[in-house]
Amino acid sequence: MAMKKLLIASLLFSSATVYGAEGFVVKDIHFEGLQRVAVGAALLSMPVRPGDTVTDDDISNTIRALFATGNFEDVRVLRDGDTLLVQVKERPTIASITFSGNKSVKDDMLKQNLEASGVRVGESLDRTTIADIEKGLEDFYYSVGKYSASVKAVVTPLPRNRVDLKLVFQEGVSAKIQQINIVGNHAFSTDELISHFQLRDEVPWWNVVGDRKYQKQKLAGDLETLRSYYLDRGYARFNIDSTQVSLTPDKKGIYITVNITEGDQYKISGVQVTGDLAGHSAEIEALTKVEPGELYNGAKVTKMENDIKKLLGRYGYAYPRVQSQPEINDSDKTVKLHVNVDAGNRYYVRKIRFEGNDTSKDAVLRREMRQMEGAWLGSDLVDQGKDRLNRLGFFETVDTDTQRVPGSPDQVDVVYKVKERNTGSFNFGIGYGTESGVSFQAGVQQDNWLGTGYAVGINGTKNDYQTYTELSVTNPYFTVDGVSLGGRIFYNDFDANDADLSDYTNKSYGTDVTLGFPVNEYNTLRAGVGYVHNSLSNMQPQVAMWRYLNSMGQYPDNTNDRNSFSANDFTFNYGWTYNKLDRGFFPTEGSRVNLNGKVTIPGSDNEYYKATLDTATYVPIDNDHQWVVLGRTRFGYGDGIGGKEMPFYENFYAGGSSTVRGFQSNTIGPKAVYFPSSSRHDGDSGYTNDCKSTESAPCKSDDAVGGNAMAVASLELITPTPFISDKYANSVRTSVFWDMGTVWDTHWDSNAYGGYPDYSDPSNIRMSAGIAVQWMSPLGPLVFSYAQPFKKYDGDKAEQFQFNIGKTW
């Protein structure tokens, strides 16, 4: 189009001139039609100046130069005596860009593509570029199966040579696959082959992966899956001959036909390794061993190549080349693999750099490195550093990049690119509950204090039954060897009666200090000491409570509901953690085991031990780690020493968002059985309706008392979160779950209390199922769950919807 205008303009100029081929001298240059473009800018773009002798070639070059600026859609050059007259029509300026009807493509993505093509507010409108964009967008819709889609650019003129640009989308509907045919398959049925496709002509309700909507990219992926399926089963001569995609007349249906040649199955006759093995021939040959008569397997060949690259990478060969060439013998149906290895140069690490850590100090990241500067590059050490950064929980993503140093044949820089997440949480709330009354809660937890890696927490709770404050600090690198030091102090004023638990009041305070010793990359041992003072009062005469007091030599009066008792305890605290999760925040693969325990030491009033074991295992079931199975368990047990019992206030409880969802917090397990007391014969809360003032026998209640043993398990399926863009995919997690748990009292005497539930029976398991959503919000982690209990017992209290701020187990 531009050349056509150029030709016309040249002809006009030629017809308007009366000079010969030798040209004429230009004394002045005048412009007509300039609005937005300054005269000076237009003159600078021209190869002609006043005083120059102008020929036809100069005029043609002038017109080309003015068109090349992109500011004009028409240019004419005329002669008026000794004056060169340039008549132009400026392209209109884009005043605004809007979109309408686009659902599959977001506005931000469209704006990025337009800007990449030079279409933005304030720039000139190039109608040719707009036409190309229209076609490109329509091609995109065709590739995802929307063959009836159309994209039209609507240009609305405005004053001062400006325009509004609006892209109007009519996306239509995606064409659905009516039938997929595979022609030429004999060894495997069509249904078996299609079962591995993402695209399907039939999708059962339970298949959340299959899709009937045609997409060109998915078809390409399915064809590669088909090829791999045959190659992995020995069909070395397998070939996809052709693929036909047919569209129905109404553009709503797709028929796909794939023509294949299976060929025969081939066995591997041997593997020959050649090339530069960098002195590691024995190790490489060990990776290429095959069993006699083993079928050719494309996936195993690829794995073998990658294993060789990883092996060489551990020794500093950062860019090895490994190529496998199959030598196919059709006569005996065998394949001999020729593996050519070129180790390449061995590289040193010049520098290790970090990018994206705007808050975290470099030293916090650098101390997690296992690769050293100045040493040979080890790919396994680089990966260990990445894993350790992920497990810190400070980052949403961690990526590595090995960059060659310009001008150096044997040096690289290792760059860790991180995206930081909010490592702190702040919560403040005022609420009202039927059990707690008016409730105030506030807390600050920062796992990466001022970017130093310190974990600092200040928490407090105030409601009708509890006043609690705690200050905790942990230095994960108390020594350069990675020994951690943590400590806390706390105060707790707790009225169990108002919390719907067994009736007593406990005012406690204490402190503890713990050292953590790294054993290896994945294991840490902990040891520490603690002190706690418990002051118990207003203890109602209750069987489990009185049993503990009797073991302590107190022998309280069963009719007195104002008993008091205090204890000072010193404890040895211990723990072990095994952590091989792929990251500390929203992990998708690996396991974590956490053992915590304590035992009283000489000088304590109580004598007991207590331990808790937590496990979590994540197993991805797809390559992208979007679908993950999570299994969790928690076991707890405690008991007295030397004839004493573990204090009842140390009992285990279950129920709530951190154990068995769908049940009210701490309500699963044994319930309190009260002795009659004179002040409670008035029907005060705590007794069931079966307890009358005239009774002298113990009375059953719905107040939870907990137990000295606990078992909880959960099976969870983590799924992609619907309606969430990729930008927030790492901040939101959705799952469906099945929880189960039980709490029991191993010292409960079912013979002595035959008319009551057997609280020593661990088989009284509660179960629930539901859905949960976790969101890493700017205020910290928020957890929402809805669960329906489907196995419960008398006295249990359901709570289907639960909301929690903070980490769950």
From Swiss-Prot:
Q: Which Gene3D superfamilies match?
A: membrane protein fhac, membrane protein fhac: a member of the omp85/tpsb transporter family
Where is the protein found, in the record's own terms? Cell outer membrane
Give the Pfam families listed for this entry. Answer: Omp85, POTRA
**InterPro entries hit by this protein:** Bac_surfAg_D15, BamA/TamA_POTRA, D15-like, OM_assembly_BamA, POTRA
Task: Write the record's keywords in alphabetical order, separated by commas.
Answer: Cell outer membrane, Membrane, Repeat, Signal, Transmembrane, Transmembrane beta strand
Give the signal peptide as a residue range, or say none if absent: 1-20
In terms of one coarse class, where is the protein primarily found?
membrane
Which residues does the UniProt record annotate as the domain POTRA? 24-91, 92-172, 175-263, 266-344, 347-421
Q: Does the keyword Repeat apply?
A: yes
- GO CC terms on record? Bam protein complex
What's this chain's function? Part of the outer membrane protein assembly complex, which is involved in assembly and insertion of beta-barrel proteins into the outer membrane. Constitutes, with BamD, the core component of the assembly machinery.
Q: Which family does it belong to?
A: Belongs to the BamA family.
Q: How does it assemble?
A: Part of the Bam complex, which is composed of the outer membrane protein BamA, and four lipoproteins BamB, BamC, BamD and BamE.
From the Swiss-Prot or TrEMBL record, give the protein name: Outer membrane protein assembly factor BamA
Q: Which organism is it from?
A: Klebsiella pneumoniae (strain 342)
